Design a protein with these regions (language model features):
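N-terminal [4Fe-4S]-dependent radical SAM core
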Residues: 1-23, 36-41, 156-159, 167-176
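Surface-exposed, flexible loop/turn segments at secondary-structure boundaries
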Residues: 12, 73, 100, 120, ...
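Generic structural signal for beta-strand residues in well-ordered domains
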Residues: 13-15, 24, 58, 85, ...
């Protein structure tokens, strides 16, 4: 059972998205320099589709849902991502502190962040980071059967580009 203890709408966790970030508790990763150690505890309210529906309704204008954590129960994250995709037009992101899972089903995710936080390497906006931020891309494999396959494109550079541009005051998103 997944629990969460807080939410916030952000503009920087997922590039070019207005994101409702849901902080999942019970994190098993325990990064030594974690800035959210309170999320290690098994606290908060149960996160299930009816709760998620209420959170979405209360946050008009969002374009993306980000599950911040959830490494204690990847199947629950997957099931919630499936619910979001089947019931809304929102994009779905998972911020995981674990390395990329080889058998992670991708069909309900638009973005996936992987890797534990290591202070000496920095976060996503550091060129030395061990963390990676992927956009899940879809490509038609066979036109007649309309078989889609998914692959990951590393877009970590967007966080680094934004940091540099903000430092010099000249940022424009490539997609705009």
């Amino acid at each position: 059972m997944l629990k969460y203890n807080e939410t916030m709408v952000t503009f920087g966790e997922v590039p070019s998205e207005v994101t409702l970030c849901i902080n999942i508790t019970g994190c098993p990763v325990h990064c030594p320099d974690c800035h959210s150690k309170h999320l290690w505890e098994d606290i908060g309210n149960e996160l299930k589709p009816v709760v998620l529906s209420d959170l979405i309704a209360k946050n008009d204008g969002i374009t993306c849902i980000a599950f911040m954590g959830g490494d204690n129960s990847p199947i629950d994250i997957y099931n919630l991502a499936e619910w979001v995709k089947n019931n809304t037009e929102l994009k779905v992101c998972w911020y995981s502190g674990m390395p990329l899972r080889k058998k992670l089903p991708l069909e309900y995710f638009d973005y996936i962040k992987t890797g534990p936080y290591k202070k000496e390497l920095g976060g996503l906006d550091s060129v030395t980071t061990n963390q990676r931020f992927y956009e899940v891309k879809k490509k038609l494999a066979y036109k007649s059967d309309e078989v889609m396959y998914r692959y990951l494109e590393d877009i970590t550079y967007k966080f680094q580009k934004l940091k540099i541009a903000n430092e010099i005051g000249d940022y424009q998103d490539d997609e705009e």
